[in-house]
């Protein structure tokens, strides 16, 4: 296969399809989503057979249980796909909305209209559910998309792509609006991220090594996040019960997600009251604690152990594991300084009953999501009321935080006049 020619052809077809998608009606887009949902229900057995072949090859390669779990299309996973498609269909269509329409002294009206981005390239690991999630969001937001999933899910993605194409055709929309890259060759990624003529934005959903590669090689703009080094700062004016709940959930609800707390900052004024019960809670849940000298002193006195001395590298680390770094700080200023220096601009939270301190934290912490008295685990498109998300961005342009339908659109200015000329 000539990868360069193959990817160029995908791009050309996607660009052509994007024009039809931009003018597609809400009814047609919803009909396509419903048709795909019904096709998945109808062909569940065939999908599972294709997926079983992918899973068998992954097992033969010795891939770990967590990887196999993400790859597997169980009955529950298929049901979740179907529910997700219907949920996206139920969301309000942002395309064509006009906002901020105002009369100007000249007599013209000026506003902004929400429009699709165009062609979105999505690069992700071997998770077949992302094929459906991404296709649904791109379709509803009026975009065409080129999907490049992990090589271990080739057969699963091909089977899903066939059903997506059928759904688009049934709704009178171009099948090229959703195309799945049908090769495991890594050169396909290299070509996709440089096709500025055909691709408007890349959304990578993968590990740190993938994101780092794309940062170095991509010519197409990206919506991305590299790390999720999330913090909770417990202020000395915090409610202790709230602090225990937030700190427990932020770390132990799920270890392997990008919105899990990786560093706990504790004000020196509340450390003696908070750390002993919290340390015992983490110990009982087998969370390894990497602590600074001040935290060690308090925890050791309370009989909490074992403890590992934290190094500077710990403040920079996204563990994605039952490991937590703990540091005692002098107060709010020190906490904000630490977060802005070591954090990844993803999600950070403060626990406090002091309104002024809470507002300072919200203003001064330079992250995509900033929270007061709530777990960092809430940084999620569904929890934020977006309905669904394509990913989370800790960049400042174009979208920031969980990226839902609106994040896959942009605004253009529209002017309504009555024959006016500029004086």
Curated annotation (Swiss-Prot):
The record's InterPro entries line, in alphabetical order, gives: Ald_DH/histidinol_DH, Ald_DH_C, Ald_DH_N, Aldehyde_DH_dom, G-glutamylP_reductase_CS, Glu-5-SA_DH, GPR_dom
Q: Which reaction does it catalyse?
A: L-glutamate 5-semialdehyde + phosphate + NADP(+) = L-glutamyl 5-phosphate + NADPH + H(+)
SUPFAM superfamilies in the record, alphabetically?
ALDH-like
The compartments listed are: Cytoplasm
A biological process (GO) annotation for this entry?
A: L-proline biosynthetic process
Give UniProt keywords alphabetically.
Answer: Amino-acid biosynthesis, Cytoplasm, NADP, Oxidoreductase, Proline biosynthesis
Question: What are the protein's GO molecular function terms?
Answer: glutamate-5-semialdehyde dehydrogenase activity; NADP binding
Top-tier EC class:
oxidoreductase
Q: In which pathway does it act?
A: Amino-acid biosynthesis; L-proline biosynthesis; L-glutamate 5-semialdehyde from L-glutamate: step 2/2
Q: What is its EC number?
A: 1.2.1.41
| Cellular component, GO, one term | cytoplasm
Key word Ribosomal protein present: no
Q: What does this protein do?
A: Catalyzes the NADPH-dependent reduction of L-glutamate 5-phosphate into L-glutamate 5-semialdehyde and phosphate. The product spontaneously undergoes cyclization to form 1-pyrroline-5-carboxylate.
- Family label: Belongs to the gamma-glutamyl phosphate reductase family.
Q: What is this protein called?
A: Gamma-glutamyl phosphate reductase
What gene makes this protein?
Answer: proA
């Amino acid at each position: 296969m000539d990868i360069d020619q193959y990817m160029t052809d995908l791009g050309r077809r996607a660009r052509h399809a994007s024009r039809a998608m931009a003018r597609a009606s809400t009814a047609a887009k919803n009909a396509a989503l419903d048709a795909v949902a019904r096709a998945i229900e109808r062909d569940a057995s065939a999908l599972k057979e294709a997926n079983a072949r992918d899973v068998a090859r992954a097992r033969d390669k010795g891939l770990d249980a967590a990887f196999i779990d993400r790859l597997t299309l169980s009955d529950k996973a298929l049901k979740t796909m179907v529910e997700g498609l219907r949920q996206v269909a139920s969301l309000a269509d942002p395309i064509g909305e006009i906002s901020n329409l105002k009369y100007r002294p000249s007599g013209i009206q000026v506003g902004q209209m929400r429009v699709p981005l165009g062609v979105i390239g999505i690069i992700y690991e071997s998770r077949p559910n992302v094929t459906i999630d991404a296709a649904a969001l791109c379709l509803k937001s009026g975009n065409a998309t080129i999907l490049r999933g992990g090589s271990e899910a080739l057969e699963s993605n091909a089977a899903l792509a066939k059903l997506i194409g059928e759904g688009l055709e049934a709704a009178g929309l171009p099948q090229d609006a959703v195309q799945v890259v049908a090769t495991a060759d890594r050169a396909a990624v290299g070509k996709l991220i440089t096709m500025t003529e055909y691709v408007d934005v890349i959304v990578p959903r993968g590990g740190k090594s993938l994101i780092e590669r794309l940062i170095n090689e991509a010519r197409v703009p990206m919506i991305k996040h590299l790390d999720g080094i999330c913090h909770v700062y417990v202020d000395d004016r915090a409610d202790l019960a709230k602090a225990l709940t937030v700190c427990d959930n932020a770390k132990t609800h799920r270890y392997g997600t990008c919105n899990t707390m990786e560093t706990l900052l504790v004000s020196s004024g509340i450390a003696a009251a908070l750390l002993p019960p919290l340390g015992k809670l983490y110990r009982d849940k087998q969370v390894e604690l990497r602590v600074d000298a001040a935290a060690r002193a308090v925890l050791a006195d309370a009989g909490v152990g074992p403890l590992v001395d934290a190094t500077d590298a710990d403040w920079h680390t996204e563990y994605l594991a039952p490991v937590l770094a703990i540091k005692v700080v002098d107060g709010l200023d020190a906490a904000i300084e630490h977060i802005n220096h070591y954090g990844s601009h993803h999600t950070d939270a403060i626990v406090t009953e002091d309104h002024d301190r809470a507002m300072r934290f919200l203003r001064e912490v330079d992250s995509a999501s900033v929270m007061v008295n709530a777990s960092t685990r809430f940084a999620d498109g569904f929890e934020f009321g977006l309905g669904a998300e394509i990913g989370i961005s800790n960049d400042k342009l174009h979208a920031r935080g969980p990226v839902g339908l609106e994040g896959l659109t942009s605004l253009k200015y529209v002017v309504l006049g009555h024959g006016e000329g500029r004086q």
